[in-house]
UniProtKB/Swiss-Prot annotation:
Compartments (UniProt record): Cell inner membrane
Keywords in alphabetical order: ATP-binding, Cell inner membrane, Cell membrane, Ion transport, Membrane, Nucleotide-binding, Potassium, Potassium transport, Transmembrane, Transmembrane helix, Transport
GO MF assignments: ATP binding; P-type potassium transmembrane transporter activity
Listed transmembrane segments: 12-34
Coiled-coil segments on the chain, per record: none
Assembly information from the UniProt record: The system is composed of three essential subunits: KdpA, KdpB and KdpC.
Name assigned to this protein: Potassium-transporting ATPase KdpC subunit
Bias type Polar residues, positions: 81-101
InterPro entries: KdpC
Biological role: Part of the high-affinity ATP-driven potassium transport (or Kdp) system, which catalyzes the hydrolysis of ATP coupled with the electrogenic transport of potassium into the cytoplasm. This subunit acts as a catalytic chaperone that increases the ATP-binding affinity of the ATP-hydrolyzing subunit KdpB by the formation of a transient KdpB/KdpC/ATP ternary complex.
Amino acid sequence: MLKEVRPAVVSLLALTMITGLAYPLAVTGLATVLFPYQAQGSLVERGGKVVGSALIGQEFKGDEYFHGRPSATVAPDPADSSKTVSAPYNAANSGGSNLGPTSKALADRLSEDVAKLKAENPAAAIPVDLVTTSGSGLDPDISPEGALFQVPRVAKARGVPEEQIRKLVGASINQPLGGVLGEPRVNVLKLNLALDAAAPR
């Protein structure tokens, strides 16, 4: 009996050591050496202080900043732990809203967001990413069209010409990887930091 079981036990222990310890440590070590910025969470600093991650969306309030996509993240309801409440940009609980196309709550939120954006820039078509949430609820990027839509509001709030802000948006566009993978996008955190540097409030 022991003769038959021994190979299985040895294999289990060997594979546990290889896949559970050696491989993760090797990959973590290589990542830290080859890609230190990414391995540490793609943290973005300003003045030596971490202000966010380039991979996680965060909320920017006020007309003087570019705003990201709506967030669908939630948190436990303090009054009833079996329920959740809206908690935008809650990085501890990433996930979509799971609201379907027939959901009244989704329709109401979309109507409210569209009305707010139409009031902000009545002449322009509203880019879809400014009213839809991402699968994670924490998308750090918006489309170039989403950023350009917000230029008049930001320029007015900062008291600078729109053309200056448009150039800043143009310089902040990340192109698809290799020209084919992904879509052109603008990282909202990095754009707002560049905005603060170029046109202080």
